[in-house]
């Protein structure tokens, strides 16, 4: 009975939060939330947003392997997303002779479209509540003393419904509200995906790392794919005789634009948030995880950047790796900045004081804090290990292939690398590993290596690259750290207490009817807000929109991040007033990249592609006055397609 009451209250409280805060489950929009959205400016009924019986806006929104979001924009399968979401695909398709990252790619005919390996596009067909079944299975596992790994529970439920929906798609079960609700989603998955259009990085990522997470920005961050099916319309692997997909629903593109205060809505697949985390969890991120990750990634970027500036072939090989390092590094630094500036730890402690009053004599919060203190040392050791030997180089696949004797795969992996770069990365990683990780965890090979060469990293490096890369990367094992942590935790894990804490937060909020929505978990969500300005600091007020004139103002021929191709610069000089990017206060996070930004009528006005630095506490703490979503204006996309790429046939198809 307690669980039934809890589930009912969860649904009630899902509509109590502030209008602009929250990533709402697309399938649970009720009349109260609908009314709030209409009060904010929405001109559609909830059924037009999500409806399993007839076409709705959600049918036009897709997940790109649950890493990004895209939108269907033509009846012949065109799908638009961010360029940075397509970056890895464009990188994989590029060669020194055809560098599509630097030069861009424009398929003027369908037979010029490039097949993309490994991409998967997910269309949500149905989502339904399976809470009772999951809970019953959990109780059964508990009663029989079976290992209760949730993935095992999910698989059993997914297998059951796979028989019900045989041949209709893929099923994924997900947890909501910290394991108090479970939903099953049915997806149709398409894997024949082809690249159609992508501007050069000098347009798509104008401003580079300098402008990343900043405002104002001037990025043409978009790319267009086409989805293909078998001739009968069913999903299929790539084949030359496949035909363009005919989607159930496409988004209408409008060129009317928006003004400050206009309603905006984002539908997408936000990845992960942790907004009900304890102060101790935030403190661990702030003091242990983020400083190490930010510094190590910065140092690795410097190593790669040095080589990329010396060799164009290395720049092409390592562009994707550098992009990934840079993005995470800036996020980690930004989180540190925001946690400190907005006093997130103290704010969480205030919440804990309120919870303690509600709990009464419970010692849960004390025990949680003590447990975090107990495991802080070993958790720091794990981060150092992961950031050096696990993530510090790109050699794992190559080394594993050699170890297995698979010389063909090893050769393929070697083609992706430059050993001069990897040697420098390994030098840095080994040095940091031996400096920070205690010898008890080194393992046999690294212990012997260090002893033989007296800690001389360069001497050790020579032996490692003389046939011992696999030994160096696998000598230290995560199991050693985990065993030590288990010993410290003594049967009561930090994670189990953190879950117990979140459950208590949920119960308190439900009892007090306080705002609450489920954390993001890579399932379809809706967030609504408005176009707005940003006042990030005292005496600084920033407008909500940028124009092409700003691209020219930032142009610097001597700075790779701000350079422009001569023909594009000439075009900009003729058109200084084209809208480029705009700001909203929609609540987004990683995974929302590429999400459609819709107006009050559900028309496509832009694509979400970034957030501002001041919003980077958002995964754990929402700062309403500072949270912003940075969007590329669809009018800039259309202008680039028309005046720069001259893709008239494509424009006819989508307009």
Where are these regions (language model features)?
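Terminal presequence/propeptide segments associated with secretion/organelle targeting
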Residues: 8, 15-655
